[in-house]
Amino acid sequence: MQITFVIPKPHGDEDTSFLRIIGANSVPIVWRDISYEYAMERTSNADEYFRFRSGIRYDFTRIGVNDIGCVEFSGIYPSNLFEEIYNYEAVTSVLAHSLEFDIIHSHDWLTYPAGIFAKNISGRPLVIHVHATDYDRSRGRVNPEVYRIEKQGMDSADHIITVSNLTRKSFRTTELEIRRISAYI
């Protein structure tokens, strides 16, 4: 089994002995005409950069990118969190056109838009992971944008993994729908 893990900004000390890590900050979303040598200077893998560049299918010029067409992700939870979520979604579209994969896993609501986009492009099944819903985290003071993202993720998922039966049972679903939801502790 091969695992490809896409993270916003790798730090370089991640354990890659059992998976491949792709830094979203090194995936071009806007075409830039640069030389191979310059790509070598600016990225860890020029061949991969050009492979991903050929996967650009949409116009993301509205998104701020650097000199090689990549988003500079913060790697933290910034004040512009929703902007980072949708920039990550743009990166995922390039990867979905560039990589071979069998399944998409979106770990939490922050990556649901990216997972949904990858599913729509690839036709591959989407599995989402739910730790808690915004309703649970906010004690009923739900952020409408977070709620919308969570709902879209749950509606689009082929399977939902929750961290507990309590979380699983908090979803108001039919018996047929509940078969899509697993609880793992």
Q: Could you describe each region identified by the protein language model?
A:
Residues 147, 153-182:
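A short, active-site helix/loop in glycosyltransferases that binds the activated sugar's phosphate group
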Residues 114-115, 171:
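Hydrophobic packing residues within well-ordered alpha-helices of enzyme cores
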Residues 84-91, 125-127, 135-152:
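Nucleotide-sugar donor phosphate/pyrophosphate-binding loop at the beta->alpha transition
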Residues 4-96:
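A conserved catalytic-core segment of Leloir-type glycosyltransferases
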Residues 103-105, 112, 118-136, 161, ...:
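Active-site proximal beta-strand in glycosyltransferases
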Residues 93-98, 120, 143-160:
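Membrane-proximal helix-turn-helix segments that form the acceptor-binding/catalytic region
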